[in-house]
């Protein structure tokens, strides 16, 4: 078994909506990013790539490459997952923690879990997503952006 950890952060800028966990969430602010700015899927992709020792999302999909301008992070996650499976890994489970003062995530989390399970070809019981605030402390608490952490467990497939 192998464990990977991922982290991502994006600052608010421009107008919304925002995309988190593949879900379009109405909000007055947008997130500044080269791709769609999905902090949850970026952190998750990094966790999965880290567990498989395949580097990180920036190495695989550099923000200097115009091909990834405005990229759908679900597509990036699926491509990373294909590469991980090619190395002989299956999914144990993933756990994602979104850190944001606003907008509230609770009503959107079930759909995030559905999308992640679809993209990884796994059961919903293998995907956990939760959200928390920083009690108005730090940059997320001041409403300057959103952060996310993710952990992934991979299992080497039996030969």
Swiss-Prot record:
> For binding 4-CDP-2-C-methyl-D-erythritol 2-phosphate, which residues are annotated in this chain's numbering?
8-10, 34-35, 56-58, 61-65, 100-106, 132-135, 139, 142
The annotated subunit structure for this chain is:
Homotrimer.
Q: Which family does it belong to?
A: Belongs to the IspF family.
- Protein name (database record): 2-C-methyl-D-erythritol 2,4-cyclodiphosphate synthase
Q: What is its EC number?
A: 4.6.1.12
Top class in the EC scheme: lyase
Named in its record, the pathway it takes part in is: Isoprenoid biosynthesis; isopentenyl diphosphate biosynthesis via DXP pathway; isopentenyl diphosphate from 1-deoxy-D-xylulose 5-phosphate: step 4/6
Cofactor(s) needed by this chain: a divalent metal cation
Q: What is catalyzed by this enzyme?
A: 4-CDP-2-C-methyl-D-erythritol 2-phosphate = 2-C-methyl-D-erythritol 2,4-cyclic diphosphate + CMP
Q: Which CDD domains match?
A: MECDP_synthase (cd00554)
- Cite the cofactor comment: Binds 1 divalent metal cation per subunit.
- Gene Ontology MF: a single term: 2-C-methyl-D-erythritol 2,4-cyclodiphosphate synthase activity
User: Gene3D superfamilies annotated for this entry?
Assistant: 2-C-methyl-D-erythritol 2,4-cyclodiphosphate synthase (3.30.1330.50)
Binding-site residues for a divalent metal cation, renumbered to this chain: 8, 10, 42
GO terms for biological process?
Answer: isopentenyl diphosphate biosynthetic process, methylerythritol 4-phosphate pathway; terpenoid biosynthetic process
The feature of type site (Transition state stabilizer) is located at 34, 133
Q: Which keywords fit this entry according to its UniProt record?
A: Isoprene biosynthesis, Lyase, Metal-binding
Q: What does this protein do?
A: Involved in the biosynthesis of isopentenyl diphosphate (IPP) and dimethylallyl diphosphate (DMAPP), two major building blocks of isoprenoid compounds. Catalyzes the conversion of 4-diphosphocytidyl-2-C-methyl-D-erythritol 2-phosphate (CDP-ME2P) to 2-C-methyl-D-erythritol 2,4-cyclodiphosphate (ME-CPP) with a corresponding release of cytidine 5-monophosphate (CMP).
């Amino acid at each position: 078994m192998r464990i990977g950890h991922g982290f991502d952060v994006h600052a608010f800028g421009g107008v919304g909506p925002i995309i988190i966990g593949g879900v379009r969430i109405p909000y007055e602010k947008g997130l500044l990013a080269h791709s769609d700015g999905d902090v949850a899927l970026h952190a998750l992709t990094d966790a999965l790539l880290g567990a498989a020792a395949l580097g990180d999302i920036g190495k695989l999909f550099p923000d200097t490459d115009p091909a990834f301008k405005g990229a759908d992070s679900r597509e990036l996650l699926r491509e990373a997952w294909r590469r991980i499976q090619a190395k002989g890994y299956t999914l144990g489970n993933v756990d994602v923690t979104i850190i944001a003062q606003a907008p509230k995530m609770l009503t959107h989390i079930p759909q995030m879990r559905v999308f992640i399970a679809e993209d990884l070809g796994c059961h919903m019981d293998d995907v956990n997503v939760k959200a928390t605030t920083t009690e108005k402390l730090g940059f997320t608490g001041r409403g300057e952006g959103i952060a996310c952490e993710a952990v992934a467990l991979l299992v080497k497939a039996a030969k």
